[in-house]
Swiss-Prot record:
PANTHER family: 50S RIBOSOMAL PROTEIN L33, CHLOROPLASTIC, LARGE RIBOSOMAL SUBUNIT PROTEIN BL33C. Transmembrane segments: none annotated. It comes from Cytophaga hutchinsonii (strain ATCC 33406 / DSM 1761 / CIP 103989 / NBRC 15051 / NCIMB 9469 / D465). This is Large ribosomal subunit protein bL33. The gene is rpmG. GO terms for biological process: translation. NCBIfam families: PRK00504.1, PRK00595.1, rpmG_bact. InterPro entries: Ribosomal_bL33, Ribosomal_bL33_sf, Ribosomal_zn-bd. The keyword Iron-sulfur does not apply. Keywords: Ribonucleoprotein, Ribosomal protein. GO terms for cellular component: cytoplasm; ribonucleoprotein complex; ribosome. Belongs to the bacterial ribosomal protein bL33 family.
Length: 60
């Protein structure tokens, strides 16, 4: 049987967008290596509603 891969898809959600109370959410999908980064990741991504780069955190 084949082994389960280490690379998984994760969803990143904007933290600043939630605080503003505006409609909708800013989410991005990316991949991470489970073996190298077991903790949740934070990346700066572009939020089209706020029109600026914001911190996006991994959600489960």
């Amino acid at each position: 049987m084949a082994k389960k891969g280490n690379r998984i898809q994760v969803i990143l959600e904007c933290t600043e967008h939630k605080a503003t109370g505006l409609a909708g959410t800013s989410r991005h999908i990316t991949t991470k290596n489970r073996k190298n980064t077991p903790e949740r990741i934070e990346l700066k991504k572009y939020n089209s509603v706020l029109k600026k780069y914001t911190i996006h955190k991994e959600i489960k």
